[in-house]
Amino acid sequence: MSRVGKNPVSVPANVEVRLSGSEVEVKGPLGMLRHELVSDISIERKGESLLVKAADDSKHANAMWGTTRALLANMVKGVTTGFEKRLILVGVGYRAQAADNVLNLTLGFSHPIAHKMPEGIKVETPSQTEVVIKGMDKQQVGQVAADVRAYREPEPYKGKGVRYADEVIVLKETKKK
């Protein structure tokens, strides 16, 4: 029995959900998201909410029950408010600049890095050391943020690198004689 799966997903008035066979389509003010359902899962509409049900008591069906419910909730939130990840660049000369759909990074390498954003992802740079990645798809926003962070992960001695805004870097102590 899934504790997450048995909770209904509330659908706001400005969101339209279309169930067709094994596909769910969620349309809202920010756009549209589509998800392919697993055969062990069914979705039932009850008024202003969606109920996710497992077809049987198999281990796979129970595992996918909570997962599908969480994915649906994220789709509804994504098309209404969207998701965002904030990155902070810490280091001398580390800079970021957003131009159209490309994020230009200077991270202490001998060359600048131009990271092209995928479809549906927007990037902003409120300051030279701050990057904001926005989009409807939670997984895609997180993946792009992880890709940008991977260019220069925070090092453990001074904390220099690209980090998430809410990330705490535990610094190591330097060796003493």
Curated annotation (Swiss-Prot):
Keyword check for RNA-binding: yes
Molecular function, one GO term: structural constituent of ribosome
Gene Ontology BP, a term: cytoplasmic translation
Gene3D superfamilies in the cross-refs: Ribosomal protein L6, alpha-beta domain (3.90.930.12)
Keyword presence, Zinc: no
Annotated keywords: Ribonucleoprotein, Ribosomal protein, RNA-binding, rRNA-binding
Gene Ontology CC: one annotated term: cytosolic large ribosomal subunit
InterPro entries: Ribosomal_uL6-like, Ribosomal_uL6-like_a/b-dom_sf, Ribosomal_uL6_a/b-dom, Ribosomal_uL6_bac-type, Ribosomal_uL6_CS
Similarity annotation: Belongs to the universal ribosomal protein uL6 family.
UniProt xrefs under NCBIfam families: L6_bact
Functional description taken from the UniProt entry: This protein binds to the 23S rRNA, and is important in its secondary structure. It is located near the subunit interface in the base of the L7/L12 stalk, and near the tRNA binding site of the peptidyltransferase center.
Subunit annotation: Part of the 50S ribosomal subunit.
Protein name (database record): Large ribosomal subunit protein uL6
Naturally occurring in which organism (per UniProt): Nitrosospira multiformis (strain ATCC 25196 / NCIMB 11849 / C 71)
Gene designation: rplF
